[in-house]
């Protein structure tokens, strides 16, 4: 085997396999985006929006916590073992949903799915960063998120189509095949990338030994104003995504939109998000991170308000396009902003902290929007989330700074 080298061209075969693998990771969660809220309402007879969105709370909390642990562990034992365990945890998910006699089975399935997404998606992100080195991070992250979220969109549409013609549980048979293929790719063809970190580390400033997780958690969460801005934006970004995952299908169904069309609207948002990240990731390398993040949050807020204020299919499609555009501006750019400030030897742990806060947003968004929807209505919940998204973008515009010339100190 040839010695490791940094660069996209030098590692193109493995990089391409990781892009493909992340499409399978995204496909697993895309199966749920259209049908699970409708399943709770129509087959399990749930009337509480908070109860229906409980599966997103289970997913978000699990994913947030395991992001933190998986990233730190990957610095110690390697990326590939974490990736494989993530896919092993995905195997029971479709079976639990297909056979579920009670809603708590769905919650349990989403605990496992959250663990799968935390381990498998985190590792594909970290492994791509390891391979390409410091100069192409935006491109690497854009391609990674493109593959994952375009697959989310594709599977959202496919699951809606299948559900409209065959039943709400039938799409999850696809999940069995996705999980098996993802596991086989991880075991057979994906290689460990920790050796590439050793190549990059000498070019970064040297300091004391890598800090403990507690110190990294503080620095990433609040100790640096730019990293704080990124973490709060990540949380609010997934807060509005959690709301759209749980409430949009119910909101559209309340306006008598057929399941197949609900699937189309739900597919547009992640598909646009995924497709445009191919451009926005590299653009952040040229234009900087702050403007794309701040304006991206503002565009998202506009799309959410359009969805709730203009109840028509065309407006909902346009709202989904705007949400997808805004999220594409934000998602890979936030990851790159975190990486700008972290030393290579603890970069994975810092990304894990950011992803903890970001994915906790799923749980916060689902719980908050569900409680508001139960108290004063679906429309009010959507309005509140749009306002929070706008406020988050303004915070980024006010306090985020450009990347430091060197990774921040931890002491």
Report each predicted region and the residues it spans.
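Cytoplasmic helix-loop-helix junction between adjacent transmembrane helices
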Residues: 111-148, 336-337
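C-terminal ends and interior cores of transmembrane alpha-helices
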Residues: 88-101, 299-311
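Helix-to-loop junctions at the C-terminal end of transmembrane segments
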Residues: 66-78, 163, 276-288, 373-374
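Juxtamembrane intracellular "pre-TM" segments in multi-pass secondary transporters
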Residues: 1-12, 192-229, 411
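Residue-level signature of mid-helix packing/kink "hotspots" within the transmembrane helices
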Residues: 60-68, 152-153, 270-278, 362-363
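C-terminal membrane-cytosol helix-exit motif in multi-pass small-molecule transporters
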Residues: 177-201, 392-401
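Helix-loop boundary and gating motifs at the non-cytosolic
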Residues: 10-60, 226-229, 233, 237-255
């Amino acid at each position: 085997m040839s010695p490791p080298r940094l660069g996209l061209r030098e590692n193109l075969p493995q990089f391409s396999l990781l892009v493909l693998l992340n499409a399978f990771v995204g496909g697993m969660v895309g199966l749920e985006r259209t049908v699970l809220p409708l399943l709770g309402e129509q087959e399990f007879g749930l009337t509480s929006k908070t109860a229906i969105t409980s599966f997103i709370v289970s997913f978000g909390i699990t994913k947030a916590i395991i992001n933190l642990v998986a990233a730190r562990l990957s610095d110690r034992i390697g990326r590939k073992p974490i990736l494989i365990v993530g896919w092993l945890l995905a195997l029971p998910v479709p079976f639990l949903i297909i056979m579920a006699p009670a809603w708590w089975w769905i919650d349990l399935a989403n605990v496992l799915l959250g663990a799968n997404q935390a381990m498998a998606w985190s590792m594909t992100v970290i492994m791509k960063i390891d391979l390409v080195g410091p100069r192409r991070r935006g491109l690497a992250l854009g391609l990674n998120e493109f593959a994952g979220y375009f697959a989310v969109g594709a599977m959202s549409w496919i699951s809606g189509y299948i559900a409209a013609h065959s039943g709400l549980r039938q799409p999850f048979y696809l999940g069995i095949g996705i999980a098996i293929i993802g596991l086989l790719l991880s075991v057979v063809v994906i290689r460990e990338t920790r050796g590439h970190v050793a190549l990059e580390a000498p070019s970064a400033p040297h300091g004391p030994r890598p800090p403990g997780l507690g110190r990294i958690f503080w620095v990433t969460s609040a100790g640096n104003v730019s990293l704080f801005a990124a973490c709060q934006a990540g949380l609010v970004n997934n807060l509005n995504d959690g709301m759209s995952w749980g409430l949009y299908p119910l909101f559209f169904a309340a306006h008598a939109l057929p399941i197949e069309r609900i699937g189309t609207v739900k597919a547009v948002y992640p598909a646009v998000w995924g497709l445009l990240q191919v451009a926005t990731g590299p653009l952040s390398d040229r234009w900087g991170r702050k403007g794309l993040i701040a304006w991206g949050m503002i565009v998202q807020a506009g799309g959410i308000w359009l969805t709730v204020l203009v109840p028509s299919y065309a407006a909902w499609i346009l709202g989904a396009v705007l949400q997808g555009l805004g999220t594409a501006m934000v998602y890979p750019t936030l990851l790159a902003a975190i990486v700008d400030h972290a030393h290579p030897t603890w970069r994975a742990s810092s990304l894990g902290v950011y992803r903890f806060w970001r994915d906790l947003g799923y749980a916060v968004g689902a719980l908050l929007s569900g409680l508001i929807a139960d108290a004063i209505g679906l429309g009010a919940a959507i309005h509140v989330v749009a306002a929070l998204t706008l406020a988050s973008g303004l915070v980024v515009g006010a306090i985020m700074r450009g990347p430091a010339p060197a990774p921040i100190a931890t002491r």
